[in-house]
Protein backbone atom coordinates (compact mmCIF):
# COMPACT_ATOMS: atom_id res chain seq x y z
CA UNK A 1 0.00 0.00 0.00
CA UNK A 2 2.95 2.47 0.35
CA UNK A 3 4.04 4.05 -2.96
CA UNK A 4 7.63 3.27 -3.83
CA UNK A 5 7.99 6.41 -5.97
CA UNK A 6 8.27 4.39 -9.15
CA UNK A 7 6.02 3.74 -12.11
CA UNK A 8 5.72 0.42 -13.92
CA UNK A 9 4.02 1.40 -17.17
CA UNK A 10 6.82 0.28 -19.51
CA UNK A 11 9.27 -1.56 -17.27
CA UNK A 12 8.87 -3.69 -14.11
CA UNK A 13 9.46 -2.26 -10.66
CA UNK A 14 13.18 -2.02 -9.99
CA UNK A 15 12.12 -1.63 -6.37
CA UNK A 16 10.70 -5.14 -6.65
CA UNK A 17 13.99 -6.30 -5.15
CA UNK A 18 12.81 -4.84 -1.83
CA UNK A 19 9.28 -6.17 -2.17
CA UNK A 20 7.45 -3.55 -4.21
CA UNK A 21 4.91 -4.72 -6.75
CA UNK A 22 3.03 -3.15 -9.64
CA UNK A 23 -0.51 -1.91 -8.96
CA UNK A 24 -2.35 0.42 -11.36
CA UNK A 25 0.90 1.34 -13.16
CA UNK A 26 2.59 2.39 -9.90
CA UNK A 27 4.94 0.39 -7.66
CA UNK A 28 3.66 -0.17 -4.13
CA UNK A 29 5.02 -1.83 -1.02
CA UNK A 30 2.04 -3.42 0.88
From Swiss-Prot:
GO process annotations (BP): defense response
Crosslink position(s): Cyclopeptide (Gly-Asn): 1-30
Record-linked PROSITE patterns: CYCLOTIDE, CYCLOTIDE_BRACELET
Keyword annotations: Disulfide bond, Knottin, Plant defense
PTM statement from Swiss-Prot or TrEMBL: This is a cyclic peptide.
InterPro entries tied to this protein: Cyclotide, Cyclotide_bracelet_CS, Cyclotide_sf
Record family assignment: Belongs to the cyclotide family. Bracelet subfamily.
Written domain comment of the UniProt record: The presence of a 'disulfide through disulfide knot' structurally defines this protein as a knottin.
Name recorded for this polypeptide: Kalata-B5
Species of the source: Oldenlandia affinis
Amino acid sequence: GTPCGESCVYIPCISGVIGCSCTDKVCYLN
